[in-house]
């Protein structure tokens, strides 16, 4: 038997590891995954009853979730619809004729959740966590990290080949010709290889103290002179921003000026067409759902796709996650239990503060800053006291299609996210 002092992990977990099995549709197993599985099975049982009209919730928000889940889980209807629900978007993107036409529609596309290649976001300021500010990120790579693009990395070309093969099987489903597919993939892969030279590696992204690069708006907009950013942000947030935080400086200084240009329109158009085809794969036929996940399963080492019933529940839960969490907490985590945990956490914080005040091995300034941080912690225990106001807007129209309702939910979420710009962080969410 393994001795404690020789291998602590093996001593504690050895017997469990001998019999533990990773589910075919999961990347790992363990105590937390077991809990996740148990909750998933419970929700499958409960939501199954709701779909059958049994024990229906009285809450109007959850009633809309039930309607949405029914649509997502109506696999016969999804098979019958095929790709028809997304062809208008694909044809709209295909019809774009120029860089100018594309840039004129950027604001509209952003608010509608359509492909637009604008890597901007709103989140708290590193230096003032009380306020939400504008961030300029970068486009995403195909491969998991920049290191996969380095010369001598054998895994990179292998994964890229798997990605391309998946796309070559997937795109014909959306009425792209063989010539169109080759043109799109050639252009996207070439641009991706160039992009990899300028975006941060995963290791660089982990060094948060080096990611904070604030720019005055007048300076930032000169980095991409062919993008009408003032028009874009006026449409999206109602005005021109005053500043932007740029963690991806190489991307914006060395890649973006030539990428976002009329001269690069054909590459941009290829990327947009690919995005239009991929955006809705989770809502279409089972064949398309499974096929579109091949590359992701390869990266994560998951041998089998998630069963369609579980995938449908996860998809439907997305827009209603906090409402479902609140319902679950009401069933499993009483207000008394919540108050008890909140009291314990508050006690723990006071203990930390007391120990910091007596920690004479720390500099006084360090102790003071640590206590300041403890004083502003807002613990989130179990469930929120209120739901975001947007939840009341998430009303499902049963006369519309699944994709039309999902589109409406996306637009509500997008508008809510942008409304946070230049506003205090709501710690109750």
Where are the regions a protein language model picked out?
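Extracellular/periplasmic catalytic domains that process cell-envelope and extracellular macromolecules
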Residues: 1-4, 126-128
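Active-site-surrounding "flap" and adjacent substrate/cofactor-binding loops of secreted or lumenal enzymes
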Residues: 2-7, 11-77
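Short amphipathic alpha-helical segments with coiled-coil-like heptad repeat character
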Residues: 11-25, 168-180, 376-378
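Intrinsically disordered, low-complexity linker/terminal regions across diverse proteins
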Residues: 36, 223-227, 245-249, 306, ...
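Noncatalytic, helix-rich "gating/capping" subdomain that lines the substrate-entry/channel surface
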Residues: 48-343, 347
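Surface-exposed patches in mature extracellular/periplasmic domains of secreted proteins
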Residues: 19-24, 54-58, 175-184, 356-370, ...
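Secretory-pathway/luminal and periplasmic proteins that interact with or process carbohydrate-rich
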Residues: 16-19, 194-204, 350, 377-388
């Amino acid at each position: 038997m393994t001795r404690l002092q020789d291998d602590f992990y093996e001593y504690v977990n050895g017997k469990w590891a001998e019999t533990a099995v990773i589910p075919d549709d999961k990347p790992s197993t363990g105590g937390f995954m077991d809990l996740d599985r148990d909750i998933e099975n419970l929700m499958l049982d409960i939501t199954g009853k709701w779909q059958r009209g049994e024990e229906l919730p009285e809450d109007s928000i959850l009633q809309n979730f039930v309607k949405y889940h029914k649509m997502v889980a109506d696999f016969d209807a999804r098979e019958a619809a095929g790709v028809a629900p997304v062809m208008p978007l694909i044809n709209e993107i295909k019809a774009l004729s120029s860089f100018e036409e594309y840039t004129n529609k950027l604001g509209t596309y952003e608010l509608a959740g359509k492909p637009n290649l604008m890597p901007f976001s709103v989140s708290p300021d590193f230096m003032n966590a009380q306020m939400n500010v504008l961030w300029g990120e970068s486009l995403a790579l195909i491969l998991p990290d920049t290191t996969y693009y380095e010369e001598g990395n054998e895994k990179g070309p292998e994964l890229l080949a798997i990605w391309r093969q998946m796309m070559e099987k997937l795109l014909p489903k959306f009425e792209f010709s063989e010539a169109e597919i080759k043109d799109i993939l050639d252009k996207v892969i070439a641009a991706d290889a160039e992009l990899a030279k300028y975006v941060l590696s995963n290791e660089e992204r982990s060094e948060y103290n080096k990611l904070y690069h604030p720019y005055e708006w007048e300076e930032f907009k000169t980095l991409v002179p062919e993008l009408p950013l003032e028009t874009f942000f006026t449409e999206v947030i109602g005005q021109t921003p005053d500043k932007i935080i740029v963690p991806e400086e190489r991307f914006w200084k060395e890649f973006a000026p030539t990428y976002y240009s009329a001269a690069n329109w054909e590459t941009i158009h290829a990327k947009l067409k690919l995005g239009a085809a991929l955006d809705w794969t989770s809502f279409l036929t089972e064949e398309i759902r499974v096929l579109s996940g091949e590359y992701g399963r390869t990266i994560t080492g998951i041998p089998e796709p998630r069963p369609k019933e579980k995938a449908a529940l996860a998809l439907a839960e997305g827009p209603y996650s906090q409402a479902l969490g609140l319902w679950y907490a009401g069933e499993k985590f009483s207000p008394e239990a919540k108050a008890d945990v909140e009291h314990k956490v508050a006690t723990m914080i006071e203990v930390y503060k007391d120990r910091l005040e007596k920690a004479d091995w720390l500099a006084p300034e360090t102790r003071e800053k640590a206590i300041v941080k403890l004083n502003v912690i807002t613990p989130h225990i179990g469930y929120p006291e209120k739901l975001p106001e947007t939840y009341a807007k998430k009303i499902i129209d049963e006369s519309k299609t699944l994709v039309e309702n999902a589109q409406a939910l996306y637009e509500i979420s997008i508008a809510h996210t942008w409304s946070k710009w230049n506003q205090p962080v709501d710690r109750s969410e």
